[in-house]
Each structure stands twice: as structure tokens, then as C-alpha cells.
Amino acid sequence: MAHVIDFKEAGFDSVLDELEWRGLISQSTDRDRLAEALNGEPITYYCGFDPTAASLHIGNLVQLINMRHLQAAGHHPIALVGGATGLIGDPRQSGERTLNPKDVVAGWADRLKKQIGGILETEGSNPVRFVSNYDWTASMNVIDFLRDVGKNFRMGTMLAKDTVARRLNSEEGISFTEFSYQVLQGNDFLHLFDEYHCVLEIGGSDQWGNLTSGLDLIHKVRGVDVNVFTSPIITDAQGKKFGKSEGNAVWLDGTMLSPYKFYQFWFNRPDSEMENLLKAFTFLPKAEIERLIEESKTNPGAREAQRTLAWEVTSFVHGEEATRQAIEAAGALFGRGGDLADIDESTLEAAIDGMKVDGEFAKVAAGDRVAEAGMKAGLFKSISEARKTIKSGGVYLNNTRVEDEEQTLQEGDFLHGRFVLIRRGKKALGVVEQA
């Protein structure tokens, strides 16, 4: 895992100063009140994660990084996995959510808990505490909910929330189920305040209305002013949210998006994004980030910033060993170090996934000529072109130069008994699979 340092090691006077410099705070309650809370004795804070999919994604990663910064500063984290709210789903910008079966949501909740536990400290003097709002919500009957919780919410305030107002004015409208979500989330904050004296909730900027519901509820029924802050929503180059409901999710679960593809996602970010991404997604000291940003401007071809970003984020999420394998796989594919035989099957399969022809790998067998296999892989238009390129020394079989135009595939050429990599020159790579 990437090395996590506290705000002093990173070059800041306080954790709040660090979070603001990194661009990790979008909106907050009164800044002085928030600073007083974070700069004093350790407080308890929480962030909620609804199990609406089998994995968290990089939009959630921003919140986990915020939690880790606060944890490193000595504050006590609570990770709420929404066993109750996950059955409902918070209102989206457009369209009603599909309600998932209870057993599916419970299974997803277990997976999310495991993911979060792999990122936050779960042992030592300041471990993360896991809670599920199902534990205090499921037993509450409708009458008690309306009398004890619902009476503290005003319709005017609820209707004014951005997402609610937008949905009300849309063609789809909004159901009472999704409209009630903010009441459940507000009650969560109150419960955690009463149970653990939790005085800070964090979330994405699209959650501001839900966060302030709990803020207002605690002020009304307990007479205490607590704090909330949100982080900016991460978007792609087209300004679209990197979220699971948008169809371009970058999952944190290695079985849903391999560590290799996760690494490549970060490595392929453009120079224009380096400053924001290095600040938000790494724990590197301020001075080192500033050096990398300057380096990306003066020597962009070196891609040191991208390489550092990809290493830091991938090792933070997937661990150092999986990250090393991803790096070695990328180098080995094009003969730039590393041995193809050392790449495990799942990493290799992820690395070559984008090299399919018409959605699949061309099928070959031992005894087929390399020239024919190269043509099937889409590297050549004809057998004669393949032979000519072999003759000039420009064809490689699993990174070994092919010397004979009539060379055939051998059983030992198939990596993991399945794949053969054929390269034309330095950059054109094709893959065939054993039939």
C-alpha cells in the first residue's frame, strides 16, 4: 500500500489546511467552527457508503482518501455501510433507481466492508469502526419513524434540496421512497451522534443536501452544532461523473476492473490533469507534488508525474505486489523488460483484452505458421506481407525475434497454455489464442 503520512510530514500546519490545498473540500459548514473541531482533540467522524453495486468506484475513493487523511491526523473514523439506505438508493440527478433484492444488497454490503477495510486502518490504536444503518432502522415501525423522526423535517426545506427540486421539475418526477432518503440519512447522523458522539459527516458534493439534513436535525433535537463537508465530484475529460450509474465506472474491486487496467487508467491521464490528481489522490508531500507538476510542464515526455500517480493510487487500492505485476506486464508486452512467462494469467488476460479482433482472439493451433497467426491477429494484410516482415527481422514471437519465414507455433509458445503474443516492430502487438 502507498505510504500514508500525516499533515505535518506532508508540510502543512493542520489537516484542514492540507485538505483544502489538495482540493478535497468543496463545501463545508462554518470554516472557523470546522477548524476548531479538526485542530483540537480527536473527534469522531463518519462517511456513508450505500451498497448499490458490488464494488466501490473512484468517486468513492475520494471519500476514503479524506477518511484516511483524518485518520492519520488522529481523528476516529466510522464507515457506515448503508444496509438500509442501500435498499432505497439516494435520488439520482435523473431517473428512478432500480430497487435491488435484500439478499443482493446484503452481499454487496459485505463486499464493500471488505474493500473499505483494505484501505483504512482496521487495527492499532485508531481503527475504523464499521456500522450498518439497517441495525437501527429496520426495527423502527412506520408510526415511530413519522413521530420521532419525520416530525423534525419541514417540507419546504426538503423540497428545496437541489436534487429533489431538479427531479420534481423533470418528466420522471420523484417517488416518496427516494424523497424520504434525506430523512433516513439525517437520522443516521443523529444516531451516530448519540451513540458515538460523532460530530462530523463527510461526502461528495452531490450529497450536500443529505448531509445538511443531519446537521439541522441534530441542532433541532439536541441543540448542538456539528459539522459537515463535501468533496468535489471527479469527472472525466468530457465533464462526466466517474460514477457507476454513468456507464464508465472505474471500479476498486480487482475482479471487476483488474489492477493492470486500473494502473493504466491513471498512467494514461493527460498532463493537464496532473496537478489536480496528484493533490487529490496521493499522500505525497506538498514539495514532491509541486516538483512533479513542474516536471510534467518542463519535460512532459518523461511522464514521471503519470508514473508516480499510477503507482501511488494503484498500490493504495490494490497493494504493492499487484501494482508491480501491472507495471511488469506493461513492460513485458512490448519487450521493455520483464518476462512474459512471469505474468500471472489474470494479469496477462487483462493486459491483452484490448487486442481482440472483432470481440475475440483469433484461434490457432500448434503447427500453424507464425506468418499465418500474425495475419489472423490483424498485424498483416497477407501472408506475403508477413513473410516479408519476418525476413527483414521485424516480427517477434513472445518477444523473441522470428528468424524463419516458415516457423511454426509450438506447444511451449502458448502462455498459460492459451495465448501467443506476436509483435510487428516496436509497437504493433497482436494476440492469438489456442483453439
From Swiss-Prot:
Q: Where does L-tyrosine bind?
A: Y46, Y181, Q185
> Which BP terms in the Gene Ontology apply to this protein?
tyrosyl-tRNA aminoacylation
Annotated ATP binding lies at K244
Which branch of life, at top level? Bacteria
Q: Where in the cell is it found?
A: Cytoplasm
- In Swiss-Prot or TrEMBL terms, this protein is called Tyrosine--tRNA ligase
Q: Write down the Pfam families for this protein, in alphabetical order.
A: SYY_C-terminal, tRNA-synt_1b
What residue intervals hold the motif 'KMSKS' region? 241-245
Biological function: Catalyzes the attachment of tyrosine to tRNA(Tyr) in a two-step reaction: tyrosine is first activated by ATP to form Tyr-AMP and then transferred to the acceptor end of tRNA(Tyr).
Q: Kind of enzyme, top EC level?
A: ligase
